[in-house]
């Protein structure tokens, strides 16, 4: 009842039956469910894609094996948003030059079964603003920014660049948007910041 339209969670940390129950509760509340892939190898990533089908989520965010994942998701209605660029390590880091990442974004966006992109912009060690503008300007699919979203300034920068959305996780649990506030108040602070920059 705070105005969230999308709620996401990672594919690790809870047993499958608890993830399934969580997805069902989110849907019952009228929100769409986003599953974030947290995998360090191809096998785990493909397992996460299969889990997205079994969980009944609406979006699958992340992953670097788009050809295989689009085959798994074909006909499911799940909107898949892979990572453009070269993603390494855990927590994930985005590597490569802006042109290389932008070309990866173009290639992915043109693939059948890809509905958007999940850009690890703040996990990039170069010019983040230039990267985001380059990727958003190069594709005709929604661009979601994930990772290290921890300030109103970053929300404003992404809005100015024209991203479709962003994910926030740890910053809410760490109280980065409203010091000493409840989880609900943290979410409300992020939504308020988003509305302010969108108007």
Predicted feature locations:
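Conserved anion-binding
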Residues: 38, 42-124, 189
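Glycine-rich phosphate-binding active-site loops on the catalytic face of alpha/beta enzymes
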Residues: 54-68, 112-124, 148-150, 154, ...
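Short, acidic/turn-prone active-site loops that include or flank metal/cofactor-
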Residues: 12-13, 38-40, 84-88, 148-149, ...
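Hydrophobic faces of well-ordered beta-strands that scaffold small-molecule active sites
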Residues: 5-9, 33-37, 60-62, 80-83, ...
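Conserved N-terminal beta1-alpha1 strand-loop-helix module at the mouth
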Residues: 1-33, 39-43, 51-56, 106-113, ...
């Amino acid at each position: 009842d705070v105005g969230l339209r999308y709620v996401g969670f990672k594919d690790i940390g809870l047993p499958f039956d608890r993830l399934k129950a969580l997805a069902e509760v989110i849907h019952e509340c009228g929100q769409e469910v986003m599953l974030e892939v947290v995998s360090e190898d191809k096998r785990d990533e493909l397992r996460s894609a299969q889990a997205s089908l079994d969980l009944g989520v609406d979006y699958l965010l992340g992953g670097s094996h788009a050809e295989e994942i689009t085959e798994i998701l074909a006909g499911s209605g799940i909107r898949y948003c892979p990572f453009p660029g070269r993603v390494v390590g855990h927590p994930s880091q985005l590597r490569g030059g802006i042109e290389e990442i932008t070309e990866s974004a173009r290639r992915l966006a043109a693939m059948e079964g890809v509905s958007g992109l999940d850009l690890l912009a703040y996990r990039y060690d170069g010019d983040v603003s230039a990267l985001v503008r380059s990727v958003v300007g190069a594709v005709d699919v929604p661009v979601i920014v994930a990772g290290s979203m921890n300030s109103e300034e970053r929300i404003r920068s992404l809005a100015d660049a024209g991203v479709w959305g962003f994910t926030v996780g740890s910053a809410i649990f760490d109280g980065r948007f409203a010091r000493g506030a409840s989880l609900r108040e943290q979410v409300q602070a992020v939504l308020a910041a988003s509305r302010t920059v969108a108007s």
